[in-house]
Amino acid sequence: GDVYKRQIHRRYPDVAILIPDSMGRACGGLCASCQRMYDFQSERLNFNFEELKPKESWDKRLRKLMEYFENDTQLRDILITGGDALMSQNKTLRNILKAVYKMAVRKRNANLHRAEGEKYAELQRVRLGSRLPVYLPMRINDELLEILREFKEKASAVGVSQFLIQTHFQTPLEVTPEARKAIRKILAAGWTITNQLVYNVAASRRGHTAKLRKVLNGLGVLCYYTCLLY
């Protein structure tokens, strides 16, 4: 019950949102368009430290979360977010990705002993949700890139075929030289970058939305979707 509710959100049967008990629950900044803005303004934070005081070690809890994924018959897509996935320390992120990889291996091996029509869905896509390529592009350091490369190499061998960083550039003004450098590094590590854009009337009137799409496409970033929040 509580273990899954706090760390795992489900909106679609084949997708799971994983929110770790780490600094990944926090954000690198506060976005005006955030779906949780109403909660933030009411002082209900996603990272309420009193509420999040651990009742068991994170390693033990992480094992339980992976068991939940392993026993799920439909799961194909895990989105690690928060907060912000890249707010977690490299060591924490490495451990999470290692746990995801081992879970995918166990699930695949278990399917070898299941009859046709009774096999569980296997993991196909892993996503990291982060706005740090915008806010703090220097977070994309050599150690992080090695973690991403290593995970992709191992996970590709067990059927995972999509590796994505989902970020949130809102205007071409945010695509700084530092952000461009971070984008190139992530792409060179073999991960795809997608951008989620919240439609903003003021920015659109000034042509920022159209220009942002052109700039990101030119850098190899896929404009994943544009959404409108009320």
Where are the predicted features?
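Short microdomains enriched in Cys/His and/or Lys/Arg
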Residues: E51-M66
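Conserved AdoMet/S-adenosylmethionine-binding subsite of the radical SAM
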Residues: L62-D77, G83-L229
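Canonical Radical SAM [4Fe-4S] cluster-binding loop centered on the CxxxCxxC motif
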Residues: R11-K55, L128
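Short, small-residue-biased leader/transition segments that mark boundaries at the very start
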Residues: V3-Y4
